[in-house]
């Protein structure tokens, strides 16, 4: 009798383990954030959770299935997809199912998880990459798309990231402006439907709108309290952030290259890699979120990021185009008294036939304007050296 009971227990346990292995649970975590995915019975990947780090794995079993992680065009979901492609037969539907995943600790508190998805009818593969910076509480995401169809596949839309949130209210902060009037802050509550932050200006992508956003949950954002998600994209061209609240008051955030005029013909067996999207989740307001990005930039992105930074005096706001040698040397004297490390000469130092004396004139050439600098830039460099400060100079690629 005991043997039969043991065998029954063993078989039930084995069956449970087999079921669990068929539906892998994938955890992407930092010290303070959990992003959790799970494969459902239909073989597709769902985001179960994004928020404050879960301290006990047992909590996961009480989470709902969630929403499909990387929504495709042409399936049962009625809202904005993360990817839209056109196959060789002109069909544009895509059904991505889980294949496998891997996780690799690259050292220095960085862990990369790669989730591979494939369509079971078309030979299309999508790999979702998540790089978690443990101490800094930053997650970097990007997507790789490849295929083995006979002819090139047309990529119409290819998001770097798709995130799902479930809260009572959502408050979006965006930053817009113009020259000398940058980063004006606007916060608004999101309602059913879409809100888009985007640009179509190409190389001037951040001219009117900044490529980052701040999203507060439940209440308007505060400096030191409340849940906030901040995101940005590592891309200097056209970008788009789409925020869509659905009929269940759930929010999806799709981030990446702006699909406007951005169709890409992808040859077989080549890999298309999207730009990186970075985000941080904070339970201590936008102040903590900002500091997370500062820490990440110093530790992982900016060259010598933890070194002492130089202080600089730029003559532009003091003089604009109205300066001469003596005025600049006087500014250097004041900079030295203040302990400034570098003096930088800005616009207006070049051209003689058509000297640059206002922004209505061209950017000229590489000749110093004799009327302003009779002894050339060399004299200014010598004066800076005498005073023990560094010398810098402003140039633009348009100068001819």
What residues fall within each predicted segment?
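Bacterial Sec-dependent N-terminal signal peptides
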Residues: 1-23
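Short acidic, Pro/Gly- and aromatic-enriched capping/linker segments at domain boundaries
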Residues: 20-25, 247-267
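Polysaccharide-binding surfaces and accessory modules of carbohydrate-active proteins
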Residues: 22-36, 44-244, 260
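Short Pro-Gly-centered flexible turn/kink motifs
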Residues: 32, 91-98, 264-283
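An acidic- and aromatic-residue-enriched active-site/binding cleft used to recognize and process polar
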Residues: 40, 148, 158-160, 348-350, ...
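Glycine-rich, aromatic-flanked loop segments that form ligand/cofactor-binding clefts
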Residues: 70-99, 218-242, 281-302, 341-347, ...
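N-terminal amphipathic alpha-helix/helix-capping segment at the start of soluble metabolic enzymes
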Residues: 266-267, 296-309
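Aromatic-lined carbohydrate-binding/catalytic grooves of carbohydrate-active enzymes
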Residues: 304-400
């Amino acid at each position: 009798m005991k043997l039969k009971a043991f065998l029954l227990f063993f078989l039930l346990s084995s069956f449970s383990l087999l079921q669990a292995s068929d539906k892998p649970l994938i955890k992407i975590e930092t010290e303070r954030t959990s992003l959790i995915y799970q494969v459902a019975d239909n073989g597709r990947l769902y985001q179960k959770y994004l928020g404050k780090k879960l301290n006990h794995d047992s909590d996961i079993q009480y989470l709902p299935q969630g929403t499909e992680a990387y929504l495709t065009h042409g399936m049962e979901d009625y809202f904005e997809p993360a990817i839209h492609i056109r196959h060789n037969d002109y069909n544009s539907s895509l059904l991505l199912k889980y294949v496998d995943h891997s996780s690799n600790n690259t050292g220095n508190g960085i862990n990369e998880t790669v989730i591979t998805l494939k369509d079971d009818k078309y030979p299309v593969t999508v790999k979702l990459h998540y790089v978690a910076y443990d101490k800094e509480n930053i997650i970097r995401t990007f997507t790789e798309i490849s295929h083995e169809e006979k002819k090139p596949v047309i990529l119409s839309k290819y998001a770097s990231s798709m995130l799902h949130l479930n809260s009572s209210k959502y408050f979006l902060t965006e930053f817009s402006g113009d020259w000398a009037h940058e980063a004006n802050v606007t916060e608004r509550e999101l309602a059913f439907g879409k809100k888009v932050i985007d640009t179509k200006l190409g190389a001037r992508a951040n001219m009117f709108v900044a490529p980052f956003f701040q999203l507060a949950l439940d209440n308007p954002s505060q400096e030191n309290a409340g849940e906030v998600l901040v995101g940005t994209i590592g891309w200097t061209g056209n970008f788009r952030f789409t925020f869509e609240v659905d009929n269940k008051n759930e929010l999806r955030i799709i981030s990446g290259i702006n699909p406007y005029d951005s169709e890409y013909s992808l040859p077989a067996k080549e890999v298309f890699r999207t730009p990186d999207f970075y985000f941080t989740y904070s339970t201590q307001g936008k102040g903590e979120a900002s500091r997370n990005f500062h820490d990440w930039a110093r530790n992982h992105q900016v060259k010598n990021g933890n070194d002492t930074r130089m202080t600089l005096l730029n003559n532009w706001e003091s003089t604009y185009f109205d300066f001469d040698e003596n005025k600049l040397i006087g500014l250097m004297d004041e900079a030295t008294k203040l302990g400034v490390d570098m003096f930088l000469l800005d616009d207006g130092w070049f051209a003689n036939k058509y000297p640059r004396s206002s922004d209505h004139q061209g950017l000229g050439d590489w000749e110093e304007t004799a009327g302003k600098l009779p002894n050339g830039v060399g004299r200014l460099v010598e004066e800076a050296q005498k005073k023990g400060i560094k010398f810098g100079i402003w140039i633009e690629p348009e100068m001819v």
